[in-house]
Design a protein with these regions (language model features):
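NTP/phosphate- and nucleic-acid-binding module
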Residues: 1-442
Length: 442
């Protein structure tokens, strides 16, 4: 099938409770979206997979959760106060504003088409500033963090002093970041409030290449576990002129979105730039004491950076399917079972038959001993329930009918188990249905 359009995904995401426009009843706010009940669970499942693969399966990782508000000197040292900006131009005719580096023609307004109406470029800092405490003076200015990485760098010394890790080791963090984007767009791809999952991995200067390849492999395995087809995920080796001046290598992991091939994640070798900047800015030594070699030095850093919202969008796009079933076109999300917000739905064939409802609730209670995400759905006829669960990405629908109760004696205590991806149904005992669920989730 053809790849779904962005509008198709946006519609499904709202219809099935994955993502809603932010502040919708007030007309919304550009660059903001709220995650609904199923979106929250899917997002948590993505986080848990990342945490397992990037942190828990390793012996050299330490998690931190740094504050969103930090001493403003942090951002001065990191260069964000002076350099976290985009060049903007204004059109004197239509009064619209544009990124200067995104214009195809620097002399023509892309909105109104007028020639010679674009002014000189000026820098616009993308950090959100606010005030700490009751004071309104300049000294009270603090920023909503534009990235999560700084929180790990400023806690480097704390972790070393508390845990005495041997190199190489890494810090990991999941958290919100805020960027005053000029033109947030493409649904949840470019947001003003976003969530990041990042690692800062500290190595000796001469050993970075091996670790870089190791993290690149982990990122590709992560993409595979998310259900992203290998032919939609690409590596872009960032050239010398486009890399940060301190980076010897940067690889962008790109994904084929409906609006083009765009950056999904990034992997960068940052040298000792960050620790050096914060050591100079704080006047506190961040050198690592190697007890075996009796050396003190600033470790170098490899940074695998994953944007959670962009990943969420890629997962929905990769899972979207349309096919013909029962003479009708249906839509379903072929989510990997470990990501699906609902693992199975249990339903009585008829909701107005107390004996069916009671038995269905018993079956659901048993299945929830295997996994808590077992949904109940008795709204509408059974066909509508199936279609609804298909669009949520539920792997199995389990129906309790009169045969379950013994109307056909040899079928007593059996259920109908329906498979999401094929629509096929099979008759299993309640115990067998539980084992099928357990095997799928293992």
């Amino acid at each position: 099938m053809e790849k779904p359009s962005l509008d198709t995904i946006v519609s499904l995401a709202k219809r099935r409770g994955f993502v809603f426009p932010g502040s919708e009843i007030y007309g919304g706010l550009a660059g903001t979206f709220d995650y609904g009940p199923h979106g929250v669970v899917l997002k948590e499942n993505i986080k848990n997979l990342w945490r397992r693969m990037f942190v828990e399966e390793r012996d050299d990782m330490y998690q931190v959760d740094a504050t969103i508000l930090m001493n403003p000197r942090v951002w001065e040292a990191s260069g964000h106060v002076a350099g976290f900006s985009d060049p903007l131009v204004d059109c004197s005719n239509c009064k619209k504003r544009f990124r200067a580096d995104h214009l195809e023609d620097a002399n023509t307004c892309p909105s109104c088409g007028k020639h010679g109406t674009l002014g000189a470029a000026r820098q616009f800092n993308m950090m959100f500033a606010t005030k700490a405490g009751a004071s309104e003076d300049e000294a009270a200015t603090v920023y909503l963090r534009p990235e999560t990485a700084a929180g790990m760098f400023v806690n480097f010394k704390n972790v070393v002093d508390s845990f005495h890790p041997k190199l190489p080791f890494g810090l990991a963090q999941i958290g919100k970041a805020f960027r005053n984007e000029i033109a947030p767009r493409d649904f949840i791809f470019r947001l003003r409030e976003l969530e990041q999952m990042e690692v800062e991995y500290f190595v000796r200067a001469g050993e970075w290449e091996k670790s870089f390849e190791e993290w690149l492999d982990i990122m590709h395995r992560f993409a595979n576990k998310l259900g992203l087809a290998s032919d939609t995920v690409h590596e872009l080796e960032v050239g010398d002129g486009d890399r940060a001046h301190y980076s010897k290598r940067t690889v962008d992991i790109e994904y084929d979105y409906p609006f083009g091939r765009k950056e999904l994640w990034g992997l960068a070798y940052r040298g000792d730039f960050d620790l050096s900047a914060h050591q100079n800015g704080s006047s506190v030594s961040l050198e690592y004491q190697d007890e075996e070699l009796k050396e003190k030095f600033l470790p170098h850093v490899i940074e695998p950076s994953v944007g959670l919202d962009r990943t969420f969008l890629a997962v929905l796009l990769a899972a979207y399917r349309e096919d013909e079933l029962g003479g009708e076109t249906r839509t379903y999300l072929a989510l990997p079972a470990h990501l699906a917000p609902i693992k199975a739905m249990v339903s009585p064939l008829l909701k107005n038959k107390p004996e069916l409802v009671e038995k269905a609730r018993e079956v659901r209670a048993e299945l929830r001993k295997i996994h808590p995400a077992i949904a109940w759905d008795d709204n509408g006829n059974i066909g509508k329930r199936y279609r609804r669960q298909d669009e949520i990405g539920t792997p199995f629908c389990i129906t309790i009918d009169f045969d379950t109760l013994g109307e056909t004696p040899e079928l007593k205590d059996t259920v109908t188990l329906r498979h999401r991806d094929t629509g096929e149904q099979e008759r299993l005992t309640i115990a067998e249905a539980g084992e099928r669920l357990r095997a799928t989730l293992s």
